[in-house]
Amino acid sequence: MSATQKNNITRLEQLDRQSTQPFPNSRKVYLTGSRPDIRVPVREISLADTPTAFGGEKNPPVFVYDTSGPYTDPEVRIDLRKGLPDVRSRWIDERGDTEILPGLTSEFGQARLADASLDALRFAHVRTPRRAKPGANVSQMHYAKKGIITPEMEYIAIRENMKLQEARAAGLLDQQHPGHSFGANIPKEITPEFVREEVARGRAIIPANINHTELEPMIIGRNFLVKINGNIGNSALGSSIEEEVEKLTWGIRWGADTVMDLSTGKHIHETREWILRNSPVPIGTVPIYQALEKVNGVAEDLTWEIFRDTLIEQAEQGVDYFTIHAGVLLRYVPLTAKRVTGIVSRGGSIMAKWCLAHHKENFLYTHFEEICEIMKAYDVSFSLGDGLRPGSVADANDAAQFGELETLGELTKIAWKHDVQVMIEGPGHVPMQLIKENMDKQLECCDEAPFYTLGPLTTDIAPGYDHITSGIGAAMIGWFGCAMLCYVTPKEHLGLPNKDDVKTGIITYKIAAHAADLAKGHPGAQIRDNALSKARFEFRWEDQFNLGLDPDTARAFHDETLPKDSAKVAHFCSMCGPKFCSMKITQEVRDYAKENGLSDESKAIEAGFQEQAARFKDEGSVIYKQV
């Protein structure tokens, strides 16, 4: 191992303070379920009292969904070398349908473990994996179909509600616009039974591998909060284990609900182990990437046996969902020939090349039922990959894209026959007028299995700003029914993202997802908006910053022009100044009404006009006066 690698592993002993410090005026709160080991984290944002001039009332705290795990809990000591605390082992043990294996069973996993040169690089506390007992199915879908509400399902119901009843009682939801959900069935409150029903129906998934016990359970489905995914991963051009773990902790701080490890460089197995042991959110992968590395990058040399071993290797580590491009069929490949941008999916191009080289059907398709057997033994969810997604708006909604989508619908039904959880990946590049057709087609072909899209990007003219071009499409398709949005950073099409790019991409997609939740009418979605709007009107600047998705940036922008502490209580900002602030003027109108005993603000405004008119006449009706 090089000196650089050793230094990187040593750095893993420490955590970037930026990723671990609590948010301003916030604290981690745990909501307890029906048993003491169901402890659901939410972030409580404390608010200042309304100033006396505005009524002087107390403002209740606002609770927001928290993906940051133990990292922002000052009561938890984080040691990346040991991994995060165990959340789920007891629940899994109680079900009595799994067994601890004597060791790793994949050939590649065993070979890596036996390689002494990797000792200083690997995660030191690798747990012995578990697997379903012979003949057992350990998927959350299997339990749901049997009518069982698991602790994971109860945990999720509490998490999705975020103290909704208390918020209603406190008046935080006195104003919420009705949504338009395009046929989604969103209840006024999420219950454990509703979670079970949605998972049993296949409309939602709980990605939760039995070997990822550090996981804080979450759900992906159109009748729940819209989720976002962030991507990390090394490449042949660089990055280290330390950098990838840092990207993970940074991404979940800002709101990534799941993270995909798309590593294609060195030490993929070891990097993934460090990520999983330190991740409170589901981790997804594209197993064909690692399988390709095992054959030195030659797609034609891939075999079912190599891929199968890769699935088992990653399932035993704890990967929660696999992107598998089983819908790239030989007959669809010629349909991409006249495209502007051809096949842009890495996984799709790998499988297309294999199909053409052997002139055989995609082995992921022909071995799909065998893949299902592996998935249900570890409760790994399918993310059925869209290997033929459009890479330009010119190619959107073509025969290749929709042909593959129809095949993904067929595969969904096969997976459901095995009680394996499924979500469907979607585009890509789609102009705004074609986005709803994508969503409607997916709901029809895939029987409402959750949709998971990359954007889509709505135009191709903005390299460097594709987080915006895609954020527009993401908000739209999230409203139409997409369950999870894969973030796009400003570096899309240009290079590997750094920490700042990751944050920008996640914040952009949190905005898109939240806008979709508002539009769908998700219960409680407007609580944060109402609280921030009230703080804005009352010039509670610190509360405005702290209620935002990115308090640091909001505070920094304000302080660029008004850096003094006194500006944090001023009744204006640098945009309009003290004399032209619309909210200050509105408050003055209200004060005038109160002083003059007028109950209607419009009457107060009219009275003010009359007063000024009388003054104009008294002063001689002169338009211009010498001053």
From Swiss-Prot:
Cysteine disulfide partners in this protein: none
InterPro entries registered for this protein in UniProt: ThiC (IPR037509), ThiC-associated_dom (IPR025747), ThiC/Bza_core_dom (IPR038521), ThiC/BzaA/B (IPR002817)
Catalytic activity: 5-amino-1-(5-phospho-beta-D-ribosyl)imidazole + S-adenosyl-L-methionine = 4-amino-2-methyl-5-(phosphooxymethyl)pyrimidine + CO + 5'-deoxyadenosine + formate + L-methionine + 3 H(+)
Cofactor section: [4Fe-4S] cluster
Biased composition (Polar residues): 1-24
Positions that bind substrate: 231, 260, 289, 325, 345-347, 386-389, 425, 452
Residues bound to Zn(2+): 429, 493
E.C. no: 4.1.99.17
Binding annotation for [4Fe-4S] cluster: 573, 576, 581
Top-level taxon of origin: Bacteria
GO molecular function term, any single one: zinc ion binding
Keyword Zinc among UniProt keywords: yes
Keywords tagged on the record: 4Fe-4S, Iron, Iron-sulfur, Lyase, Metal-binding, S-adenosyl-L-methionine, Thiamine biosynthesis, Zinc
GO cellular component: cytosol
Pathway annotation from the record: Cofactor biosynthesis; thiamine diphosphate biosynthesis
Region ranges (Disordered): 1-29
Free-text remark on how the cofactor is bound: Binds 1 [4Fe-4S] cluster per subunit. The cluster is coordinated with 3 cysteines and an exchangeable S-adenosyl-L-methionine.
Known role: Catalyzes the synthesis of the hydroxymethylpyrimidine phosphate (HMP-P) moiety of thiamine from aminoimidazole ribotide (AIR) in a radical S-adenosyl-L-methionine (SAM)-dependent reaction.
Family: Belongs to the ThiC family.
Stated name of the protein: Phosphomethylpyrimidine synthase
Species this chain originates from: Pseudomonas paraeruginosa (strain DSM 24068 / PA7)
